[in-house]
Amino acid sequence: MHRPKILMASLSLAAVKIVSGAEVVRPLLVEIRHAPEALIAADGVKAGTGRFSFDSYDHERVLSVVAGNVLTLASREELALMQQDGLEVVVVMESEDKLTLIKRALYGEKLQLDPIYHRYDQIVRRADELAKAHPELITRLQIGETTQFRQPIYAYRLSNDVTRLQERPAVLFNGCHHSDEVMGAEIVVALMEKLVAGYGHEQEVTAWMNSLEIYLVPVVNVDGHNVVTSGHDPRWRKNLRDVNGDGVTGIYPEGVDVNRGYDFNWAMGGTDDPLKANYRGAHPFSEAENCAMRHLADTRQFLLSVSYHSQGEVIYYPWSWHGLPAPDDAVIKAIATDVAAHIRTMNGQGTYAIAPGGPSSQSYPWFYGRRGDFDFIIETGKGSHLFPPAEVPGIVAANLEGVRALLAHAAGPGLAVQVTDATSGQPLVAEVWLPAIENEMVDRRHSDARFGRLWRLLKPGKHQVIVSCPGYRTVVIRDCLVGENSWTPLKVELIRAATTP
């Protein structure tokens, strides 16, 4: 989850006064069925105006608001007030154990996650089956291990020939930085199935696999994902680091927020309080899960990437930094707008929204600011982190339409740069700078070591490009014309600088 608070459901002002007083004992799980639209509050409504708030970092009251039905913890006094208000209220469960009530609300009657969701071992097993059946289309890469239990974190590379790294743009999709946001894993697994099954049969899928390298990380936070999918605790967001060093893990809310651990304005993001849901850890890349993603980015430059979260039906893109947009805002925002327009909301009445996110500690500012990758957080679904089974296929299908839109942008327009040594023809790691676009907010982009390649999405038109490499003469191209619809090739051969005797 990206933003901490979305205000979802309204009750009487008297109920809020009860809530805002001394600590309230809430032994009831209550469902408000068919809540009137007027009782669904807009983002930004403050507590004390007659509304309960759904807070993604808090499980004290409202636990989910899906399809107009509200699941909330309540005291007996609050239940009476809801009934007085004429709401259609059903007591789902009564228990003195708060976790049991939360499990009933988020897991369902069996107090276990519905099997429509995949456990990590099931994901790995299915991916291995696909790789065995189609070894040319999908291969497994171990990119790291989890912080606490040293479980392998896997990425999967898909293309028409995965037996070798190919000289083409790469795109990344990942899920479950936050372990309770399990929808991300479902979307990535569905995409894996689609790519393998569709190659050679669906024209669009075949074109993607023939022109791109597609990387999938279904679950970044494997330890935390296991906590949720095992039925231990549906609230679990963070990894399983034993922060207090007592040798005990899995006691809520211990752990580190994996999506606050990236080294881009790290100290500005999250909190240094270990008890908070967005605890950022001891230092940047303190968590092995973040290091695994960094390792993947070290081995392959990505043109575009998506990190799936829940909830909100919104796409966050880089960024608004003290009110200033990202250097590539014109292109990034256009892509976000297009992708969002292709993802239908759960109620079928609209499409996802877009918003610039903050510039600190999360995946998208790091991938963009440090690596030049246009990275997006897509908050899937609305009103919960664990969605009822009936909602899952629709959310997955809607987001696969977003994948289609995103991958269309991997065809350009922009520059397909290749930098080589003018004498040997060997690829060079060279800085490729567009001074009219890039400023000191972001790191300079470089061609890769294997191919001397850099794919750079740009608006059509003329661009100044400066290519430099230590020991070589700098090349300045003042009016490099980028075409309208596809990649414009730019081959740069650098000449060694004269050495002083």
Range-by-range predicted roles:
Residues 183-228:
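Short helix-loop-beta-strand segments that form the rim/entrance of peptidase-like active sites
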Residues 470-498:
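Structured interaction patches on ligand/partner-binding surfaces of diverse proteins
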Residues 71, 139-142, 154-157, 170-174, ...:
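Structural recognition of the beta-strand scaffold that forms the well-ordered cores
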Residues 426-460:
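Short, acidic Ser/Thr/Gly-rich low-complexity loop/linker segments typical of extracellular
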Residues 22-111, 472:
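Extreme N-terminal flexible tails
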Residues 223, 229-422, 429, 454:
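Metallocarboxypeptidase
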Residues 460-471:
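A short, solvent-exposed beta-strand micro-motif common in secreted/extracellular proteins
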Residues 115-171, 243-247:
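Soluble metallo-hydrolase cores and metallopeptidase-like ectodomains found primarily
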